[in-house]
Regions:
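Mature-chain termini and adjacent capping regions
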Residues: 1-128
């Protein structure tokens, strides 16, 4: 563990698993960043060949799954859970499939906020 300014950094390697609720992220190594004053987890960066994630969307067991070279996991200013998939990014949900160089996904809303191309795939509107 190291301290860099106001951030405490913990690095883990070899078959890393990160879970929060129904979200599960698997990778080769992970970097956990904590606020040094509050000890609050602020960001997790996972690297892999590839990084894999899955999350149960609803009580019926529907899953969203994805892969990428790197995945960043954090909460944004609206306190929404964000997954940034970077490098060979792929997301599949019951109604959508997308492959891009990078994808920013809001897991709380099953919503792709941004995608950097080239991209290919199919997105369907989902009722809220």
């Amino acid at each position: 563990m190291t301290i860099q300014g106001n951030i405490r950094v913990l690095e883990m390697s070899a078959n890393v698993r990160v879970t929060q609720g129904t979200l599960e992220i698997l990778g080769d190594e992970a970097i956990f960043e904590y606020d040094a004053n509050s000890n609050e987890l602020t960001k997790v960066t996972v690297h892999g060949t590839p990084v894999r994630f899955q999350q149960q969307l609803d009580e019926d067991g529907a899953l969203v799954i994805g892969t990428s070279d790197t995945l960043l996991f954090y909460s944004d200013e609206l306190d929404e859970t964000i997954l940034e998939l970077v490098g060979n990014a792929n997301i599949e949900s019951p109604d959508s499939t997308m492959r891009c160089e990078a994808i920013i996904y809001i897991s709380d809303r099953d919503l792709i906020r941004e995608a950097a191309g080239p991209c290919q795939g199919m997105l369907s509107s989902q009722p809220n």
